[in-house]
């Protein structure tokens, strides 16, 4: 019986226990047995096992893996490819690096089984530019496996060939998107393609292609070896199996952990990772990486599976859990996220190229205390436009942390907009680092606040519909009130 406070190692079972360069040590611990089994099965039988297991993608939206297999296997073009997406560009994420650096043969085996299932004889591993130091380990492991007959030509004397090649990106985050990744492998600029046609019909080099994340491919061998029923006994009904979580941020114990799907987020933070570092309080958590939803401290008692996280407005995606303590300003965190996204946009589509920049500008105005309530309405309209019209997932997901943070931390945004008091950064009372005297700040017709008051009327009128916030911004709690009580000195 699994203890919910302990890890369950299915994918990480060989971490620290084998030499990652040795295919024989991998084989001695049960490696390549699933591939041997697959080589004696036909394509449909392999796909049926993956279908019955309920395996879903571990890198993005949780698309059923068997459907990618099925679409690619049934494509009319006989030349097909398997592509492993190892472009782990999400800030703070390390799960794929751990798998590739400690157990690369598990990924190779999953790719070879997928190749047998769809009729592909060539696979590519696309490694992010920052992981090129892993090339020696990967190449040594692959060469050793080919020398011993586990992989390559005539694998295990089955008559089936499967060759694995390596390619590296140049550091562009957008190349994690599947069609931009294809463009990069082909030597072109890494920009997303218009779809349809989809990769299972027109993928790498214009051929049917099955592309999956490192973690997804690593799941294939254990499923085929132990059976679909075994796999479904782990996790939840709609999200079977285990998941790798990268926990980072303000916790005592950080790292990559493996738990069954459906583990409780609160348990991970407090029971596994030792709680918030330095005795501080919890402000919020961002799940699924920089493009994931940001929830507040009252929402963390939730199960982590694909559907539950999606229902909260985000995605489980890469499984990154960023823990944010109360010494951080949520508006500033969102602004940093947007700074990352606007720099990583490939610029091909207008919604992402211009929308990302405009979102950054609007949130920057809020963080500096220069915004008004209509700016929140502009953000809402802009994020919805990006979600509906952007060419690829980068533009779609840019909106997620903004929308969810405004929904779950509205009080903090209003505090900045009112230029009242942010308990962390005090930006609500400071514009571009300049402290203004209280009487000028509120009454001078030439000051920013004076001009805004003249345009919109008394400040309280702006918040008649926000009763809770009206209580929050009482004179005693405001920066202005504390300024006056201190005789005009800085708070």
PLM feature spans:
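Gly-rich Lys/Arg/Thr-decorated short loops/hinges at beta-loop-alpha junctions or inter-strand turns
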Residues: 26-32, 84-96, 199-204, 246-251
């Amino acid at each position: 019986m699994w203890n919910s406070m302990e890890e369950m190692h299915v994918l990480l079972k060989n971490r620290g226990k084998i030499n990652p360069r040795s295919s024989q040590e991998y084989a001695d611990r049960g490696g390549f047995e699933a591939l041997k089994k697959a080589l004696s099965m036909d394509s449909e039988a392999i796909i049926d096992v993956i279908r019955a297991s309920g395996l879903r993608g571990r890198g993005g939206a949780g698309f059923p893996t068997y459907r990618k297999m099925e679409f690619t296997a049934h494509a009319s073009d006989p030349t097909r490819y398997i592509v492993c997406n190892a472009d782990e560009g999400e800030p703070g994420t390390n799960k794929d690096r751990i798998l590739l650096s400690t157990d690369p043969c598990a990924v190779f085996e999953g790719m070879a089984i997928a190749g047998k299932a769809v009729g592909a004889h060539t696979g590519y591993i696309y490694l992010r530019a920052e992981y090129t130091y892993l090339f020696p380990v990967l190449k040594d492991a692959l060469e050793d496996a080919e020398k011993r007959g586990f992989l390559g030509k005539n694998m295990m004397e089955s008559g089936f060939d499967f060759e694995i090649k390596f390619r590296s990106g140049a550091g562009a985050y957008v190349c994690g998107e599947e069609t931009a990744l294809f463009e990069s492998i082909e030597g072109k600029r890494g920009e997303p393609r218009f779809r349809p046609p989809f990769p299972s019909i027109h993928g790498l080099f214009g051929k049917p292609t099955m592309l999956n994340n490192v973690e997804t491919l690593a799941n294939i061998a254990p499923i085929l070896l132990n059976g679909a029923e075994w796999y479904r006994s782990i996790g939840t009904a709609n999200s079977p199996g285990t998941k790798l979580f990268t926990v980072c941020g303000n916790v005592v114990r950080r790292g990559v952990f493996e738990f069954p799907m459906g583990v409780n987020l609160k348990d991970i933070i407090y029971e596994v990772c030792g709680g918030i570092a330095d005795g501080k309080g919890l402000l919020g958590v961002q799940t699924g990486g920089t493009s994931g939803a940001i929830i507040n401290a009252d929402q963390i008692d939730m199960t982590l599976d694909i559907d539950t996280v999606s229902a909260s407005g985000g995605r489980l995606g890469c499984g990154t859990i960023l823990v944010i303590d109360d010494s951080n300003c949520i508006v500033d965190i969102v602004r940093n996220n947007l700074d990352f996204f606007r720099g990583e946009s490939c610029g091909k589509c207008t919604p992402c190229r211009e929308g990302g920049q405009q979102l950054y500008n609007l949130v920057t105005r809020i963080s500096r205390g220069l915004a008004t309530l209509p700016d929140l309405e502009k953000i809402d309209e802009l994020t919805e436009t990006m979600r509906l019209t952007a060419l690829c997932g980068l533009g779609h997901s840019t909106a997620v942390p903004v929308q969810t943070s405004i929904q779950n931390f509205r009080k903090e945004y209003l505090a900045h907009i009112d230029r009242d008091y942010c308990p962390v950064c005090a930006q609500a009372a400071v514009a571009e680092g300049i402290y203004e005297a209280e009487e000028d700040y509120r009454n001078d017709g030439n000051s920013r606040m004076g001009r805004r008051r003249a345009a919109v009327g008394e400040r309280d009128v702006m918040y008649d519909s926000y009763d809770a916030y009206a209580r929050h911004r009482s004179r005693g709690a405001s920066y202005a009130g504390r300024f006056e009580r201190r005789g005009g000195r800085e708070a």
